[in-house]
Amino acid sequence: FDSHISDWILWLPTTKGFFSPRNVKDVHSYGVELKANVDVRLGRQWALRLDANYSYTPSINVGEPISAADRSVGKQLPYVPRHSASLTGVVSWRGWAFSYMWCHYSERYTMSSNDLSLTGRLPKYYMSNISLEKSLQLRWTELSFKCLVNNIFDEEYLSVLSRPMPGINFELFVGITPKW
């Protein structure tokens, strides 16, 4: 893809703890997004699904400097990773599904100048999640119960500067899909 965007609204954190919009006059966002998947039947009741995704997304400020001190022109937008990838594997059997998901996010800048100081960038990180799901087919509905364990290796990471994300955490879901 190759996009030229006018008036890109960039939400950046402030020193007061909230996000504030900032207008970036002109942005050139380009790159490649790749996706692949494979479905394999392993006998009558077993199935395996593999999904892979990769994105290369430079997003560059190509507008005019807003002041003499503006060093953001020609630089990657803050908090936008250049590279991201994910791999997911799902094994299914008799209404049960076990999945493993691995994600990667490249280094992200926290300042529009792409300053390489300690606070000017967030390091790359890798994330792993697992889930177990059971689906039940009833005459009038489909019920599903799902348990997720996110960040199973307790990776320390930041999505926004000075705001650590949770370590290992859990989610439970119940789904009801009526059959009308």
Set out the residue ranges of the language-model regions.
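Acidic surface patches and DE-rich sequence motifs
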Residues: T14, G43, P123
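Conserved C-terminal beta-signal and adjacent last beta-strands/turns
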Residues: L48-D51, K75-W180
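Gram-negative outer-membrane beta-barrel transporters
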Residues: F1-H4, S20-Y109
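Flexible, solvent-exposed coil segments and beta strand-coil junctions
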Residues: L10-F18, E64-D70, E107-N114, N150-E156
